[in-house]
């Protein structure tokens, strides 16, 4: 029988932890404030990102923080990078803004490298600036470092459920900058044997079939994409595999979610499985809160005193 890897406990516990730190920070006049930039005007991406941002914003407000959402997706394509850079420079200078998320994926015409290079690493909640990416190449501290939210959330779920990745054959399907790439690097740092599959990989199924752990982070459900669609089904995995589903998109016409993993068939063979609703999404949201508290302390140490440490 499958064991469901649920995110509710991690999410609730992190919210309580974050509330306690918000109270401590408020005693010295600092309130966590998250700024989120939305730049992608693709209908599917925009609808999906709006859902995610709404949930993140609710979490931040529930712990006592503040949120500012900047909708830049209506700017003309030729001006969108420039307007985003101007806003990022302003947010970097504002001491009341303690964390920034540039919501990914970005449209192809936006200069992603320029945006993340411009963002202050001190306020980088998603850990995607060049300086913060380097942290993954050395030993990282899952509890204390600002790390990519979804990969760190997945590793926290593994820790909570006692899933050891050392020496395991792990397949990561998807090589995106937000999940696939950083997660693969983090898993290698934890001594897993990692294979990364993507749209150009030949014969993906044999790799998936022999994997001890399969992490699907594609986000191209067949219902919404005719070009390179992806869905993980039960016949593709071995008996007893651990399966983590990350990818999901919202149909802007019906408002329905569609996911990477066929939950019903995979549950018949997997030993552990994240539910499409209430699994990795909650773990990611928990990590957003944890990272925001970390970046807020970094801002507070610069503005007030380097002696203001977390406890």
UniProtKB/Swiss-Prot annotation:
Domain of life: Archaea
Short name of one Pfam family: THF_DHG_CYH
Annotated EC: 1.5.1.5, 3.5.4.9
Catalytic activity, reaction form: (6R)-5,10-methylene-5,6,7,8-tetrahydrofolate + NADP(+) = (6R)-5,10-methenyltetrahydrofolate + NADPH; (6R)-5,10-methenyltetrahydrofolate + H2O = (6R)-10-formyltetrahydrofolate + H(+)
Molecular-function annotations in GO: methenyltetrahydrofolate cyclohydrolase activity; methylenetetrahydrofolate dehydrogenase (NADP+) activity
Keyword Oxidoreductase: yes
Keywords noted in UniProt: Amino-acid biosynthesis, Histidine biosynthesis, Hydrolase, Methionine biosynthesis, Multifunctional enzyme, NADP, One-carbon metabolism, Oxidoreductase, Purine biosynthesis
Pathway where it operates: One-carbon metabolism; tetrahydrofolate interconversion
InterPro entries xref list: Aminoacid_DH-like_N_sf, NAD(P)-bd_dom_sf, THF_DH/CycHdrlase, THF_DH/CycHdrlase_cat_dom, THF_DH/CycHdrlase_NAD-bd_dom
Disulfide pairings: none
Family annotation (CDD domains): NAD_bind_m-THF_DH_Cyclohyd (cd01080)
Gene3D superfamilies attached to this UniProt entry: Leucine Dehydrogenase, chain A, domain 1, NAD(P)-binding Rossmann-like Domain
Transmembrane regions: none
Binding site for NADP(+): 174-176
GO cellular component: cytosol
Gene Ontology BP, a term: L-histidine biosynthetic process
Subunit record text: Homodimer.
Described purpose of this protein according to its UniProt entry: Catalyzes the oxidation of 5,10-methylenetetrahydrofolate to 5,10-methenyltetrahydrofolate and then the hydrolysis of 5,10-methenyltetrahydrofolate to 10-formyltetrahydrofolate.
Family to which the UniProt record says this protein belongs: Belongs to the tetrahydrofolate dehydrogenase/cyclohydrolase family.
Protein name (Swiss-Prot/TrEMBL): Bifunctional protein FolD
Native organism: Pyrobaculum aerophilum (strain ATCC 51768 / DSM 7523 / JCM 9630 / CIP 104966 / NBRC 100827 / IM2)
Encoding gene, per UniProt annotation: folD
């Amino acid at each position: 029988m499958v064991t469901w890897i649920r995110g509710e406990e991690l999410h609730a516990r992190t919210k309580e932890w974050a509330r306690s730190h918000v109270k401590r920070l408020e005693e010295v006049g600092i309130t966590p404030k998250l700024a989120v930039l939305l730049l992608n005007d693709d209908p599917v991406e925009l609808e999906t990102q709006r859902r995610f941002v709404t949930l993140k914003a609710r979490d931040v407000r529930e712990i006592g923080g503040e949120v500012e959402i900047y909708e830049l997706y209506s700017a003309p394509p030729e001006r969108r990078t420039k307007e985003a850079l101007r806003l990022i420079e302003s947010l970097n200078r504002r001491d009341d803004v303690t964390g920034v998320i540039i919501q990914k994926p970005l449209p192809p015409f936006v200069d992603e490298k320029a945006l993340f290079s411009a963002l202050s690493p001190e306020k980088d909640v998603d850990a995607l600036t060049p300086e913060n990416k380097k942290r993954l190449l050395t030993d990282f501290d899952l509890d204390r470092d600002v790390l990519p939210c979804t990969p760190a959330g997945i590793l926290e779920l593994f820790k909570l459920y006692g899933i050891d990745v050392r020496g395991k054959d792990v397949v990561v399907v998807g090589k995106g900058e937000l999940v696939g790439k950083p997660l693969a690097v983090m898993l290698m740092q934890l001594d897993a044997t990692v294979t990364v599959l993507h749209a150009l990989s030949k014969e993906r199924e044999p790799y998936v079939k022999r994997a001890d752990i399969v992490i699907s982070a594609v986000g191209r459900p067949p219902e919404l994409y005719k070009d390179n669609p992806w869905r993980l089904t039960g016949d593709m995995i071995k008996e007893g595999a651990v399966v983590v589903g990350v990818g999901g998109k919202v149909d802007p016409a019906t408002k329905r979610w569609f996911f990477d993993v066929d939950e019903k068939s995979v549950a018949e063979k997997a030993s552990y499985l994240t539910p499409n609703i209430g699994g990795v999404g909650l773990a990611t949201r928990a990590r957003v809160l944890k990272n925001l508290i970390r970046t807020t302390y970094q801002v507070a140490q610069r503005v007030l005193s380097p002696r203001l440490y977390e406890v």
